[in-house]
A protein has these predicted regions:
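Structural signature of the thiamine diphosphate
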Residues: 11-32, 148, 154-173
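Short glycine/serine/threonine-rich phosphate/pyrophosphate-binding segments
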Residues: 39, 63-73, 151-159
Length: 209
């Protein structure tokens, strides 16, 4: 698949799906970026969160199709409006109005703004770099014995830094949503050579004198 103008693959893949749909009789597109069923499927998790926490200040949720953050935020805010929802995205994604650029790690972010995110209730946004995302995954594994994927690593680092610089006099109660496992990232995030090569690619070019 060719990369799209943002440096990702999503838009070209969607174009291919639309071409196949137009050429195929009785075809159906399960568009997770626009189908309300995506976020409505998370209402149950939102209710479970509410019943599990007597005190809850923040929920950190990564975005891609945005089903999770939309469904959880709508469900939680309806019952506990004081809980703050923090959306976590990666540099290069356009979901929160940033300019798109090449992303080397799948599973978080998108090359388009998902229509369903218009229904989300988001209080804060944290953008994590691709290298910090990798660091978050390794810290989760080394310090917490959690073998998680890209979205989880981004959420962990975002929450860790957020709490560090929080204005709260007491440590807030935060819930971190970890939606992915690490086994699909063995050849990327957890491959030391790959990670080192990515770090070299993402190093800023030296300034001319």
């Amino acid at each position: 698949t060719k990369r799209d103008h943002t440096g990702g693959y999503l838009l070209t893949r969607i174009d291919t799906v639309n071409e196949l749909y137009a050429a195929t009789d009785n075809a159906f597109i399960a568009d997770q970026y626009a189908d309300p069923s995506n976020y409505k499927g998370y209402y149950g998790l939102g209710n479970e969160i509410i019943t599990s926490f007597d005190k809850l200040d923040y929920i950190f949720i990564a975005v891609s199709s945005s089903g999770a953050i939309t469904g959880i935020s709508k469900s939680v805010k309806q019952q506990r409006p004081e809980v703050r929802i923090v959306g976590v995205d990666v540099e290069g994604s356009v979901i929160f109005g940033k300019e798109g650029s090449k992303r080397y790690i799948s599973g978080i972010g998108a090359s388009k703004v998902p229509p369903i995110i218009e229904n989300a209730i988001i209080d804060e946004v944290v953008i994590v770099s691709q290298l910090d995302l990798i660091r978050g995954c390794h810290e989760l594994l080394d310090e917490q014995a959690i073998f998680a994927g890209a979205s989880s690593g981004a959420v962990y680092l975002a929450a860790k830094n957020h709490t560090k610089y929080s204005e709260h006099l007491t440590v807030p109660t935060s819930l971190l949503i970890f939606p992915d496992k690490g086994h699909t990232y063995l050849d990327t995030i957890y491959d030391r050579e790959w990670a080192e090569q990515l770090a070299e690619k993402l190093q800023p070019a030296p300034s001319a004198h």
